[in-house]
Amino acid sequence: MELVLVRHAEPEWVREGLSVDNPPLTDRGRDQARRLADRLAHEHFDAVMVSTMQRACQTAAPLLEVLGAEPRFENWLEELRMPDWTGTPSEEVDELFTRARARPIEDHWDGMAGGESFRAFHERITKGLEASLAPLGTFPTDDDTPLWEIDDEDARVLVVAHAGTNATIIGHMLGIQPLPWEWERFVMFHASFSVLRPMRIGQGWSFNLFKLGDAEHLPDQMRTR
C-alpha cells in the first residue's frame, strides 16, 4: 500500500497585519494547487482523504477535479490546533512562537497555551490513521516491531493535509520515536507531496520514505514554506 501525502498550498495567515484562523489560500497558493493537480492528474488512488481545514480543502479541489475522485473529509487530519488568534497583530503571534521555541524541551509537549498539546495531537493523528487504513487491509502487527500487515500492497491512498499532520504520519509509519517538532524533522514546502512505500520484512511489511516534499512541479520563485 502506497501512501501519498500532500501538504496544502500557501495560506493567507495574515490579512492587513492581523492573523487569520483557518485561512483560505493566497493567489499564489491557488496557483500552486493547480500546478500540483497537473502533476498528479494521471495518477490513480483507491482512497482519498482530505483535512477539513479550509486551506487543505482548497488545495484538494483542483486535484479532485482532475482525478474524478470522491474524497473523505476527515477532521482527525487537521493540523495541531492552535489558540484562536483571529484579529491578533501578526507581530504578537510571531513573538509567541519565538518564546515557545525557547521553552525547556519537556514543555514543548504541552503545545501552545490555550491550544492542543502535542501528546493529544500525536494520539489523534496516529489513531485516526490506523482506523482509516484498517478497512483498506493495512494495520500494525501485534508485536513491538514497527511492522505492518498489508492485504493489498498495490493499493494507493492520497492524503491532503498539513506539515505537522503529514510529518507525524511519516514518523508513525516508519516507527520513529515521536518528538513535539515533527514538522521540523520532515520539511515539506507548500503544495509538495511525500510518498511512503511498503517493503516486505520477515512476516510483515515496513515502510520506506520514497519521496519527501517533492515540489518539482513548482518553479523556484513559487516555492514557499
Which residues make up each language-model segment?
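Beta-strand elements within well-structured catalytic alpha/beta cores of enzymes
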Residues: 2-6, 151-161
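Loop-to-helix element that buttresses phosphate recognition and phosphoryl-transfer chemistry
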Residues: 4, 10-63, 114-128
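Active-site metal-binding loops of divalent metal-dependent hydrolases
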Residues: 9, 163, 213-215
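Phosphate-coordination/substrate-recognition cap region in phosphate-metabolizing enzymes
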Residues: 35-102
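Short glycine-rich phosphate-binding loop at a beta-alpha junction
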Residues: 45-52, 140-148, 156-160
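Acidic, low-complexity terminal tails and accessory targeting/binding regions
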Residues: 80-91, 138, 146-155, 171-225
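Short glycine/proline- and acidic residue-enriched helix-loop micro-motifs
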Residues: 98-123
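GST superfamily/GST-like fold recognition
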Residues: 163-167, 192
